[in-house]
UniProtKB/Swiss-Prot annotation:
One GO MF term attached to the UniProt entry: arsenate reductase (azurin) activity
Chain positions of site Involved in charge transfer: 100
Reaction equations catalysed: 2 oxidized [azurin] + arsenite + H2O = 2 reduced [azurin] + arsenate + 3 H(+)
Cofactor section: [3Fe-4S] cluster; Mo-bis(molybdopterin guanine dinucleotide)
GO BP of this protein: respiratory electron transport chain
Similarity comment: Belongs to the prokaryotic molybdopterin-containing oxidoreductase family.
Binding site for [3Fe-4S] cluster: 22, 25, 29
Quaternary data: Heterodimer consisting of a large and a small subunit.
Note describing how the cofactor binds: Binds 1 [3Fe-4S] cluster per subunit.
PANTHER family from the UniProt entry: NADH-QUINONE OXIDOREDUCTASE SUBUNIT G, RESPIRATORY NITRATE REDUCTASE
InterPro entries attached to this UniProt entry: AioA/IdrA_3Fe-4S, AioA/IdrA_lsu, Asp_de-COase-like_dom_sf, MoPterin_dinucl-bd_dom, Mopterin_OxRdtase, Prok_molybdopt-oxidoreductase
EC number: 1.20.9.1
Name the record gives this protein: Arsenite oxidase subunit AioA
Gene transcribed to yield this protein: aioA
């Protein structure tokens, strides 16, 4: 949105219409993009506009959603200007016309030179002397590929390091994960790679996968028909908004009872129940309680005690006999061992978690006590960052899934043990070359590596122990900058030698591939401009594995390219360098990147997985990805197809609604494997901070801000709301600190310090806080510890610190609301 407007131009009937999946959260709401000449607009009569709606009279409620933020004016490379409108699709089964505060701003985030996206990277940029200068792709690749080659030729590929996206949505997609992955793993063959939100190359669901159950195993429709929905370490209203509003709440308020009767004839059904596991009373809990307070249970556990909670519940339901005995006997292994290891009485469970025994019993009865005629309840367990980033990710998932398997709450409609997700998904890559989980941040901190590429991510804001990472990266980067600044008149080849020599003295050459010059630009020497959906064709899948094609409808700014084509440029430059030297083995390694479009990359990766003659490919589409084509995906529109694809019938892809309905699991023996998960308390580094500091520093997202605020930092709507990352405090704690709403406070511990804006909230427990995660101004990751579990997954949620008042900024107090965010505002 280039400027504020109080009217919205309607698209004419001949406007171009394309499909778009929301760029942001994992729900992947369906939208339509309308594009037409700037100096034209449609009429108010239904036959005069592309929406087919009659604006000559008052429209019925929710007939459509139109706001100025859903419109923009874009300019093509030939100078032609067009209006665009991006609005939610009522026919999409995901959102049914609902928009979120994130997706509803997509049009404004499309590039316009006079809009909020004016700071987009348009050309490769090279740090020369003391300033950033635009350069050509040829020059940028001569430096980037030249340094890569020099390091490879010296024989230590581990010195070439990456931090990269592994997901779908605006910052990823099947085309781009394949392009980047093929470059890193097949061509360069470096093992020193980390993923965007964790400091190694790993899964966030190792335990569940080892137990035979993938983390996205049901459909959003299952939430409509569940007897009980568990929300564990998850705030779905703010982080999966329209999944919560369009699928969860209708169950809670009884709107889906007729559907349950149709699906489960002869089985007792009724309005749904919800159980939230979260130390904090979130907006999701407030909304659910406003909807049906007597059908909502909040288990406000002590921080980090999830394992104890699930072990206590497992022990109790086994004692009561509320388990699927036949299923356990026929389709699982390891039950007795898990029950023995996880043994915990309700009394001990209550003591550790802080949840009363009565609440624990009620949760167990709601969720696992057989219904009339012995029918097992259909209970869906949804989890996210409270587990993913919790106290020993591996152990928590094991304990939760032990409970789920014992009660057969997977593979039946209305069940599922699923992560709610952050980004959309879109993974297809060659296997990691060694399978190692290298703690890349620590490699950098310890002075290892020569070349670091941050690709579609910003770990300066989002990593654990982020302050230490930034400090060392900046110091090592400066060694290279100092050497480069003295290299006046150097050719690209000479500059590569100078950079390499500087890395031999402790320096680190940094490249950032992104939409914007993020905080990483402070350390970078080279920035490469990427494109996002709309400027390219991109496929992703959402949290129910629903794959869609977001169609290109505009030019990317300047010379920006899709990530897959950036990867191809790097590979082809290296190939040419090795051809010139007559090294056929290296030429072969860097071959296979002859892509002209992102569709070429899609065909080379996603559609080749599991096909005869193809190299090994890890793909979320599996071996039937070959059935997906851009043509079929365009025809499938915003509803797409749920992966894996079973077959194509009459030009339509037939997908998979739910996994494990045949009781065949993803293990060698096809059975679900219980996994012992003892309660071990808090990790030592976390316990040490807890002993020294008063406040638990919980953290997470807010509805209005997407991830690292890479777009939002340029949006006045968001910036004025949150000029600084906020920290919610108990009012009594705030008073004892002499802190008023809107004050600036320092948050600190042994790992770092950061600033935040005080936000007293009556729902916050004493000594608990909640800080906005990953924000551009006030970085919560500065105070997380460097502790990781056996799979190098950090405990982002587990840190303690102190808080002190810094002062007051009067402008904040005049313009920033600190009204309680809960929807039951009293």
């Amino acid at each position: 949105m280039s400027k504020n407007r109080d009217r919205v131009a309607l698209p004419p009937v001949n406007a171009q219409k394309t499909n778009m999946t929301c760029h942001f959260c994992i729900v992947g709401c369906g939208y339509h993009v309308y594009k037409w000449d700037e100096n034209k607009e449609g009429g108010r009569a239904a036959n005069q506009n592309a929406l087919g709606l009659d604006f000559t009279k008052q429209l019925p409620p929710f007939a459509t959603t139109l706001t100025p933020a859903m419109t923009n004016v874009i300019t093509a490379k030939n100078g032609k200007r067009s209006n665009i409108m991006i609005i939610p699709d009522k026919e999409c089964v995901v959102n049914q016309g609902l928009s979120s505060t994130r997706g509803g701003k997509m049009a404004g985030y499309m590039y316009a030179a006079d809009g909020m996206t004016a700071d987009r990277l348009k050309y490769p940029r090279f740090y020369a002397g003391d300033q950033w200068l635009d350069t050509s792709w040829d020059h940028a690749m001569a430096i980037y590929a030249g340094l890569t080659k020099k390091i490879l030729d010296q024989g230590n590929v581990r010195d070439i390091m990456f931090a990269t996206f592994d997901h779908g949505g605006a910052g990823g997609g099947f085309e781009n994960t394949w392009g980047s992955g093929k470059l890193m793993f097949s061509a360069i063959q470096t093992p020193t790679v980390r993923i965007h939100n964790r400091p190694a190359y790993n899964s966030e669901c190792h335990a569940t996968r080892e137990m035979g159950i993938g983390e996205l195993n049901n459909s959003y429709e299952d939430a409509q028909v569940a007897d009980v929905i568990w929300s564990i370490g998850n705030n779905p209203y703010e982080t999966q908004t329209n999944y919560f509003l369009n699928h969860w709440l209708p169950n809670l308020n009884g709107s889906t009872e007729e559907k349950k009767k149709q699906w489960f004839a002869g089985e007792p059904v009724g309005p749904g129940l919800m159980i939230f596991v979260d130390p904090r009373r979130t907006t999701s809990i407030a909304i659910a309680e406003q909807t049906a307070k007597d059908r909502v249970l909040h288990l406000d556990i002590n921080p980090g005690t999830d394992v104890a909670l699930f072990n206590g519940l497992l022990t109790y339901v086994v004692q009561q006999g509320w388990i699927a005995k036949e299923f356990i006997a026929q389709h699982t292994v390891g039950f007795e061992d898990a029950v023995k290891t996880n043994q915990m009485s309700l009394a001990d469970c209550s003591r550790i978690t802080g949840v009363s025994e009565d609440k624990l019993r009620q949760a167990a009865e709601w969720s696992y006590k057989p219904k009339a005629a012995g029918k097992m309840p259909r209970t869906m367990h949804a989890y996210e960052k409270g587990i993913i980033w919790g106290n020993d990710n591996y152990n928590i998932q094991s304990s939760l899934l032990d409970l789920v398997i014992a009660t057969q709450n997977v593979g039946r409609r209305g069940t599922g043990c699923v992560r709610m997700g952050g980004h959309q998904e879109g993974y297809v890559r060659p296997p990691h070359p060694t399978g190692e989980k290298i703690y890349v941040d620590q490699e950098i901190i310890q002075g290892k590596g020569r070349m670091m590429t941050w690709w579609g991510c910003n770990n300066f804001q989002t990593s654990n122990n982020a302050q230490a990472l930034r400090e060392v990266s900046l110091r090592r980067s400066q060694i290279v900058k100092d050497a480069m600044s003295k290299a006046r008149g150097a050719s690209a080849a000479e500059m590569v030698d100078i950079i390499y020599d500087a890395t031999s003295k402790g320096g680190l050459f940094v490249t950032s591939i992104n939409l914007y010059p993020t905080k990483l630009s402070e350390a970078a020497h080279l920035m490469l401009p990427a494109a996002h959906p709309g400027e390219m064709n991109l496929t992703s899948m959402n949290g129910e594995r629903r794959m869609r094609l977001s169609e290109k409808f505009m030019d990317a700014p300047g010379d920006a390219l899709p990530d897959c084509l950036i990867a191809a440029k790097a590979a082809n430059t290296l190939k040419a360098m090795y051809e010139a030297e007559g090294k056929p083995e290296m030429v072969k390694r860097f071959s296979g990147f002859d892509w002209k479009t992102e569709e070429d990359a899609f065909n080379d990766g996603f559609r080749s997985a599991g096909q005869p003659g193809a190299e090994p490919i890890d793909s979320q589409g599996g071996s039937t990805g070959v059935l997906a084509t851009y043509t079929l995906l365009r025809a499938a529109g915003t509803n797409g197809v749920q992966l894996p694809i079973k077959r194509v019938e009459n030009g339509k892809m037939i997908g998979t609604a739910i996994h494990y309905d045949d009781n065949k699991f993803d293990t060698k023996d096809g059975k679900a494997h219980f996994k012992p998960a003892p309660w071990n308390g808090l990790p030592k580094p976390v316990e040490e901070q807890k002993a020294k500091h008063k406040f638990w520093l919980n953290n997470g997202r807010a509805n209005e801000v997407w991830q690292s605020a890479y777009h939002d930092q340029y949006n006045d709507f968001v910036k004025s709301r949150y000029p600084l990352a906020y920290i919610e405090l108990n009012p009594g704690d705030a008073q004892s600190l002499g802190v008023a709403a809107g004050d600036v406070v320092e948050v600190f511990n042994d790992y770092g310090s950061t600033f935040a804006m005080a936000y007293p909230v009556k729902d916050m427990k004493p000594s608990h806080t909640f800080m906005l995660f990953g924000y551009v101004n006030g970085i919560q990751g500065d105070v997380t510890t460097d502790w990781v579990d056996r799979n190098i997954i950090p405990y982002y949620k587990g840190t303690w610190g102190s808080v002190r008042r810094i002062g007051s900024i009067e402008q904040y107090k005049k313009t920033v609301s600190t009204k309680r965010r809960a929807f039951d505002n009293v």
